[in-house]
Amino acid sequence: MPTSPFIDDLIRDRRAKRGFLDQPVSIEMVKDILSAAKYAPSSSNTQPWRCYVITGEARERITTAAVEAYRAAPEGLPPEYPFFPQPLHEPYATRFNSFRGQLGDALGIPRSDITLRRRDVERQFRFFDAPVGLIFTMDRRLEWASFICYGCFLQNIMLAAKGRGLDTCTQVFWSMQHPVLRTELNLPDDQMVVAGMSLGWADNSLPENQMSISKMELEEFTTFVHE
């Protein structure tokens, strides 16, 4: 049977990394990653994605503004779109709570420690110290199908980065920073902030980057229909 072990390994090895080394990533490498990712499928070739590459002084300015905005409103600004239903129902609530507990244990943050939890959120808005931050926007007049297309584009970026030895963390939290990003990036009103992404060389010595995340077995999410 034909196999593609390289692609399969990239998919299995990709993980969200929440801490990066102080090691630069060349703009040429970022361009190569995005140039490969643009071949993602999209409905009727609509290609709804738009990407902002944040580095250098701009990265420092934007992350500082984002952290300051979060400190001014630590309960969080309304995101451009809802992340989860409230309350989150089963089986998703169990999976969510299991992951958050595992991450909290790796970070050494008890759920009751609001100060440390907020400090961890601030790390999100510093792109987890990655040298490159990506911000993704989409025309808000588009409908739900475009989010499916966007997911394909984001996955392509993650895999293209992984194939070059880099790692990523996709962060929907950046959607809550749309006022800051609208100002800093001069975003038009018709562009909604979909997500951000940290891109760099992972610091795999960090406990949070050594987590083993369980996935459903094939039989749990697949139904084979023969007749």
UniProtKB/Swiss-Prot annotation:
Record-annotated residues binding FMN? 14-18, 172-173, 215
> According to its UniProt record, which cofactors does this protein need?
FMN
Q: Which family does it belong to?
A: Belongs to the nitroreductase family.
Q: How is its activity regulated?
A: Inhibited by dicumarol, p-hydroxymercuribenzoate and salicyl hydroxamate.
Record: residues binding NADP(+) = 44, 109
Catalysed reactions, as listed in the record: N-phenylhydroxylamine + 2 NADP(+) + H2O = nitrobenzene + 2 NADPH + 2 H(+)
**Which pathway or pathways does this protein act in?**
Xenobiotic degradation; nitrobenzene degradation
Q: What does this protein do?
A: Involved in the biodegradation of nitroaromatic compounds. Catalyzes the two-electron reduction of nitrobenzene (NB) to produce a nitrosobenzene (NOB) intermediate, which is immediately reduced to hydroxylaminobenzene (HAB) by a second two-electron transfer. Also active on menadione and nitrofurazone. Replacing NADPH with NADH results in a 4-fold decrease in the reaction rate.
What is expression of this protein induced or repressed by? Answer: By nitrobenzene.
In terms of pH, how does activity behave?
Optimum pH is 8.
Q: Please report the name of this protein according to its UniProt entry.
A: Nitrobenzene nitroreductase
Q: Which GO terms label this protein's molecular function in UniProt?
A: nitrobenzene nitroreductase activity; nucleotide binding
In the record's cofactor note, how is the cofactor described as bound? Binds 2 FMN per subunit.
Which gene specifies this protein's sequence?
nbzA
How it assembles, according to the record, is: Monomer.
Look up the record and give one Gene Ontology term from the biological process aspect: catabolic process
So what EC number does this one have?
1.7.1.16
A Pfam family of this chain: Nitroreductase
Temperature-dependent activity: Stable at 40 degrees Celsius and below, but it loses activity rapidly at temperatures above 45 degrees Celsius.
Keywords, comma-separated and alphabetical: Aromatic hydrocarbons catabolism, Flavoprotein, FMN, NADP, Nucleotide-binding, Oxidoreductase
Please name the source species: Ectopseudomonas oleovorans
Superkingdom of origin organism: Bacteria
